[in-house]
């Protein structure tokens, strides 16, 4: 899969990438999180192959939502190797579900591109709707209330600051890590998209999503390399 996609209607994602999620979920030792995350993911996996992660910003391409969340899951696995005191099942649960309600937030056509926000997307937004999805599934499954609450908090706080849409700031380690990794993946995508068309030593135009910065292509990296999500 290549970030600098010339064809915004194809990411190269396929059903096997949703299978990776189920393998990840089935490896959880926490049975409550395994059932909860597995249920919600299974109900939405067909949409994930098509849905973009944004209307206009990062990963605003067909399958971009799956691409973005899969990137974060991979990053979470690396973080947990370095920091063994992190609750891996909880962090991965938040990574898999943090943007799941974007399947409700956007109106998406056959091309897999968002053509606007749904009524629910405008009035409620994907953070709150995601927490609502967790609560509804948890109630049906009889999920442990503490685990339900922690996962809801991770979804509600993953934008980091209220000015960026967070309902609350991250208040425990796994929530903080999810917020930082979400931001990192979005910015890597945006910067890579900005510099790939540029010649060496050129600057992009000012990018609103990157604090109105102009991004520099130093020319030392191979921007044509694919993102490794397999």
Residue positions per predicted region:
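Acidic, carboxylate-rich catalytic segments that either coordinate divalent cations
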Residues: 173-230
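Generic detector of well-ordered alpha-helical segments enriched in charged/polar residues
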Residues: 18-26, 34-38, 152, 178, ...
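Divalent metal-dependent catalytic cores for phosphoryl transfer on phosphate-bearing substrates
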Residues: 57, 78-198
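Solvent-exposed, flexible loop/coil residues
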Residues: 52-55, 61, 65, 69-70, ...
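Acidic/His-rich, divalent-metal-binding segments that scaffold phosphate/diphosphate chemistry
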Residues: 2-121, 161
């Amino acid at each position: 899969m290549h970030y600098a996609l010339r064809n915004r209607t194809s990411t190269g994602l396929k059903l096997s990438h949703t299978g990776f999620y189920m393998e990840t979920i089935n490896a959880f030792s926490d049975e409550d999180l395994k059932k909860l995350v597995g249920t919600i993911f299974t109900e939405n996996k067909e949409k994930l192959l098509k849905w973009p992660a944004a209307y206009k910003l990062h990963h605003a391409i067909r399958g971009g939502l799956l691409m973005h969340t899969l990137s974060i899951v991979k990053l979470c696995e690396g973080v947990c190797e370095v920091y063994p005191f992190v609750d891996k099942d909880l962090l991965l649960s938040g990574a898999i579900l943090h943007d799941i309600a974007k399947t409700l937030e956007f109106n998406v056509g056959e091309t897999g591109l968002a053509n606007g926000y749904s009524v629910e997307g405008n009035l409620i937004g994907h953070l709150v709707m995601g927490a609502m999805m967790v609560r509804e599934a948890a109630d049906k499954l009889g999920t442990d209330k503490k685990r339900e609450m922690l996962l809801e908090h991770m979804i509600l706080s993953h934008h980091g600051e209220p000015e960026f849409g967070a309902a609350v700031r991250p208040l425990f380690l796994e929530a903080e890590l999810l917020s930082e990794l979400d931001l990192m993946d979005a910015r890597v995508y945006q910067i890579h998209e900005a510099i790939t068309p540029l010649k060496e030593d050129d600057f992009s135009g000012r990018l609103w999503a990157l604090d109105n910065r102009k991004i520099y292509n130093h020319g030392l990296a191979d921007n044509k390399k694919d993102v490794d999500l397999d």
